[in-house]
A protein has these predicted regions:
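Low-complexity intrinsically disordered segments
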Residues: 21-32, 144-186
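Conserved binding-pocket/active-site segment within a compact domain
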Residues: 100-165
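A glycine-rich, hydrophobic loop/mini-helix early in the fold
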Residues: 46-85
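Alpha-helical rod/repeat scaffolding segments in eukaryotic adaptors/tethers
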Residues: 42-45, 49, 88, 112-122
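Basic/polar, acidic-poor N-terminal "presequence/leader" segments
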Residues: 10-44
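Alpha-helical repeat scaffolds in large eukaryotic proteins
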Residues: 29-36, 53, 57, 104-107, ...
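Aromatic- and glycine-enriched beta-alpha-beta binding-site module
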Residues: 68, 74-116
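N-terminal amphipathic/basic-hydrophobic helices that include classical n-h-c signal peptides
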Residues: 1-13
Length: 186
């Protein structure tokens, strides 16, 4: 009986350990490299991602690396990973929407600055966010995108402070609105 109880305690303590943002980025980078090299299966990666995105810092670290990095994971998401991301609920939807807004606005910023490489990187993140949002829970995505759209185009709602925090201007907000509509068009 003791080994079972010990195993349950160990499992519980592992679940209680939430990575910092920095740790989450490092762990995610290692996992994606293993997955890209076919050293771990879609299912193993999905289980790990499910655990990672259970905390806000874990999810933030995961998305920074997976959306902006060189791994092709976000370009061809395995069903098992989609299932874990959908199962993570509103937190993943929220971060995906915020990443969509930020990458879209930064693409405008980099275009203005004439930095084509950075613009392309921001556009890739934006495109990955659009595709991801099309795969997540539709009702949650719709509600969250409507909230962002209200702030970007009508300067109302909860996301006004988020957009103001980053100092986005009218052209950037219009681009964010266009990206929101791009999710719906898919």
């Amino acid at each position: 009986n003791r080994p079972i109880a010990l195993g349950q305690e160990l499992k519980r303590s592992m679940a209680d350990q939430q990575p910092t943002f920095q740790q989450a980025m490092e762990i995610t980078a290692a996992w994606l490299q293993q997955w890209d090299n076919e050293e771990i299966s879609d299912e193993v990666l999905a289980d790990r991602i499910g655990e990672m995105v259970a905390s806000r810092d874990g999810a933030r670290g995961f998305f920074v690396v997976s959306l902006a990095g060189e791994s092709v994971l976000m370009d061809r998401l395995p069903d098992a990973v989609v299932g874990q991301l959908r199962g993570a609920g509103a937190g993943v939807v929220d971060l995906s929407v915020r990443n969509l807004a930020m990458s879209t606005a930064m693409a405008v910023h980099h275009r203005r600055a004439g930095d084509e490489a950075q613009q392309a990187g921001s556009e890739r993140v934006s495109s990955r966010c659009i595709e991801l949002l099309r795969l997540l829970e539709p009702a949650e995505v719709k509600e969250r995108l409507e909230q962002l759209l209200a702030a970007a185009l009508d300067n109302r709602g909860e996301d006004v402070a988020f957009l103001e925090k980053w100092g986005y201007d009218a052209e950037q907000k219009q681009a964010i609105g266009d990206s929101v509509y791009a999710v719906a068009e898919g």
